Design a protein with these regions (language model features):
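Intrinsically disordered and other compositionally biased segments
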Residues: 9-11, 34, 40, 358
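Secreted/luminal cysteine- and crosslink-motif detector
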Residues: 15, 23-25, 166, 187
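Long, contiguous interaction/recruitment modules in multidomain scaffold/adaptor proteins
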Residues: 261-279, 283-287
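Alpha/propeptide regions of enzymes that mature by internal proteolysis
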Residues: 42-247, 254-256, 277-303, 330, ...
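Short acidic, glycine/serine/threonine-rich helix-capping segments at coil-helix boundaries
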Residues: 303-378
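N-terminal secretory signal peptides that target proteins for export/translocation
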Residues: 1-22
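C-terminal substrate-recognition/cap domain of FAD-linked oxidoreductases
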Residues: 248-251, 265
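Bacterial N-terminal signal peptides
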Residues: 25-38
């Protein structure tokens, strides 16, 4: 494959030679971040015979150099996008395969990266033998921070992508640089038939209202502070605010991998949340992320509160009603006092309610846990 690095607004040349069918053809349309080609220059939305198998999607794949986390956030007008588009392995890379998505880009791409290929090299190797290449959209990032994105010429408007350049551009005319409130943003912009290469993240989309969705994905991810999951979630919400999929919303997913980050350290699935079908899948994804944090993330120091008599009075009637609270052990305790018996009953209750990672032994309670307990018991 010979792909010329794009200049914004000018389509690149792409020539293919050879090729054979994929071993695992899939039927989803992968979304790449939009490019700034005028709508008049892109093909009209004329559904092909395989249109219903396409994942009308926008996604972002990214690497967090501070933690080593890798992740993907995606939304689509297609059910169960989380079972098709996102692929990731800790210490290796992350892949989003959309727009008649081919799972081989996930499986083989990550295998190639694990053997030493960069995100770009892995992408180009797989592209060589893809006989339906121009129906694909793919974003890749490796654990060294390299990123790459490709949008096929037969993807539906609006379609394109953006990747972060993460430093001084080597081909200045291929980059867009803008100064924002938080510093300088640097992105590589690409359209149909183009492979774009950069650093840190790759955002891509197809069948969008306009290029604003991909622009929002890229800019919001760069400007948002916090952990990778929060940055990906913010980017996904901003992408939808930019117009999103022309056909609407249906499913969404968030995948973040970290070495030993899964349950009891048994795997790398630090966060793996999927919304199969919902009227507002992004809002549901955000709700489930908050729930996941509550039950699987430890407390933050800023959220810890001393258990005051006022808090004891709030929790006392709840513990009296709950078997796990063991009321017979502390009914005779001094009223309003968070003594050892009360604290032991509270810990038993918290374990019973799956707040395990936020249980305290120091006379404090997590503010978020307290709010959750009171909210549930007030229903």
């Amino acid at each position: 494959v010979d792909v010329v690095t794009p200049i914004e607004g000018h389509p690149a040349r792409c020539g293919l030679s050879g090729g054979h069918p994929w071993r695992w053809p899939a039927g989803l349309l992968t979304v790449l971040v939009p490019v700034t080609l005028p709508l008049s220059a892109q093909q009209p939305l004329t559904p092909p015979s395989h249109f219903q198998k396409l994942a009308h999607t926008y996604s972002i794949v990214a690497y967090d150099s501070a933690t080593g986390d890798l992740g993907i956030a995606v939304q689509s007008k297609f059910p169960n996008v989380g079972g098709i588009v996102p692929w990731a392995v800790s210490g290796v890379g992350a892949v989003a395969t959309q727009s008649l998505g081919n799972t081989a880009y996930g499986e083989e791409g990550l295998s190639l990266i694990s053997q030493g290929a960069t995100a770009e090299e892995a992408l180009r190797i797989i592209m060589r033998t893809d006989t339906m290449l121009q129906d694909r959209q793919v974003g890749m990032v490796d654990a060294r921070g390299n990123s790459a994105s490709f949008t096929g010429t037969r993807t539906f408007d609006w379609a394109g992508g953006r990747v972060g350049c993460g430093g001084k551009p080597t081909v200045p005319e291929a980059f867009t640089m803008e100064t924002a409130e938080h510093g300088t943003l640097c992105e590589v912009v690409g359209g149909k038939g183009q492979v774009i290469v950069g650093r840190g993240f790759a955002a891509q989309a197809n069948i969008m209202v306009s290029d604003q969705t991909v622009l929002n994905l890229a800019r919001t991810f760069q400007l948002t502070r916090g952990n990778l999951a929060d940055r990906l979630m913010a980017a996904l919400k901003a992408g939808q605010a930019g117009g999103g999929d022309r056909r609407g919303m249906q499913s969404a997913a968030l995948l973040v991998v970290r070495k030993h980050g899964g349950y009891l350290g048994a795997n790398d699935r630090f966060i793996d949340i999927r919304v199969y079908d919902a009227p507002d899948p992004i809002a549901e994804l955000e709700r489930l992320l908050a729930l996941h944090k509550l039950h699987f993330f430890p407390s933050e120091e800023r959220d810890l509160l001393p258990i005051t008599p006022a808090i004891v009075r709030q929790l006392e009637p709840i513990l009296l009603r709950e078997p796990a609270g063991q009321p017979e052990k502390w009914l005779k305790a001094p009223e309003g006092k968070a003594n050892d018996v009360f604290l032991a009953a509270l810990r038993d209750f918290m374990y019973w309610e799956n707040y395990d990672v936020r249980v305290r032994m120091d006379g404090k309670i997590d503010r978020i846990v307290l709010e959750d307990i009171l909210r549930k018991r007030s229903r």
